[in-house]
């Protein structure tokens, strides 16, 4: 499928999935993946995030499962509002624009508090996630090397 056809299908799916008047759709954020994120702004100013996650490049079922596992642990993650996995389309709740980096650079006096919260969350995920580990691939040497290649590909753009 051509990208232009995919874009039309994606926009149509969004419009059919949201039961409200959409004011606009704008690019949101990006990550080191083939996913694209768009903020959907409704006429009442509510927002959602639409995700275009091509299934030939992304494991969307695993993405949904990890979101459920983290949510079950009490970790703040976007809620899955709707999904169409055959095409890799998702609508998730919008957690806003603020990142930890934003907080660190705008409020240096509390940076140690943010790091403590982050380490606490990582510890919580490590301890609480033990029961779910069999559902996820092992983070072994090969996976770690693959993740390091992502850094080179997406951030350094050397390949």
Regions found by a protein language model. Give the residues of each.
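Juxta-kinase regulatory segment immediately upstream of eukaryotic protein kinase catalytic domains
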Residues: 1-22
